[in-house]
């Protein structure tokens, strides 16, 4: 039995790293974002459960942003909502939420009196005239204060102003997340 458990665990690890399933890709992106916060300066105060867990246990906390961090030197807190997308919509907009979710995040920010940032991962296929069958992707990341993400779908003029390097660690300064 131990052998089959190990095989199952190995398959899950492989699936986590290569799956295109939206739920798994979203979890992978959340983990990536979490790892961009240095444990020397940040601590996770709250983390929502995986969506599937919340659904199975009928939990309400998945309505909150994914993380609440504390910046250790000052004790300031802020929330992060992660979303991972693989395309723009037909109007060339980046859809990051629905209207109900946007409203919940706005209420959360107001009630908790802490800023909420929307961290969006966008992975788009690269097109090459030399290798038309090649599967390559370019990854983008955006860090948008909720006050600037006023609609569930954002125009390029909005989200392009908040681009950041995909692998660059986050830092906090004067109430702003960079």
Spans of model-derived segments:
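Non-catalytic C-terminal interaction segments of nucleic acid-processing enzymes
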Residues: 1-9, 17, 21, 36-39, ...
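A short, highly charged nucleic-acid-interacting micro-segment common to nuclease
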Residues: 11-35, 56-57
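Short, flexible/disordered intra-domain loops and linkers
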Residues: 18-20, 54-62, 88-97
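N-terminal targeting/trafficking signals and adjacent low-complexity tails
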Residues: 24, 47, 90-92, 159
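A short acidic/basic microdomain associated with nuclease active sites
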Residues: 34-62, 66-70
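Conserved catalytic cores of phosphodiester-cleaving nucleases, focusing on short active-site segments
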Residues: 37, 65-89
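A structural signal for short, well-ordered beta-strand segments and their strand-loop junctions
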Residues: 45-46, 79-81, 116-120
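Short, charged, amphipathic alpha-helix that recurs within catalytic cores of restriction-modification
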Residues: 85, 91-121, 125-126, 130
């Amino acid at each position: 039995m131990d052998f089959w458990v190990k095989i199952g665990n190995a398959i899950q690890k492989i699936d986590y790293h290569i799956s295109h399933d939206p739920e798994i890709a979203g979890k992978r992106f959340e983990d990536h974002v979490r790892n961009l916060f240095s444990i020397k300066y940040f601590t996770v105060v709250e983390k929502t459960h995986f969506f599937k867990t919340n659904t199975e246990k009928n939990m309400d906390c998945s309505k909150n942003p994914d993380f609440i961090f504390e910046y250790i030197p000052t004790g300031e807190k802020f929330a992060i909502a992660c979303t991972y997308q693989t395309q723009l919509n037909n109007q060339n907009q980046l859809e990051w939420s629905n209207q109900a979710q946007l409203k919940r995040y706005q209420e959360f920010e107001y009630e908790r009196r802490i800023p909420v940032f929307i961290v969006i991962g966008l992975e788009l296929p690269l097109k090459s005239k030399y290798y038309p069958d090649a599967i390559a992707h370019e990854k983008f990341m955006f860090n948008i204060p909720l006050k600037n993400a006023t609609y569930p779908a954002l125009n390029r003029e909005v989200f392009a102003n908040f681009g950041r390097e995909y692998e660059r660690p986050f830092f906090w300064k004067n109430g702003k997340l960079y």
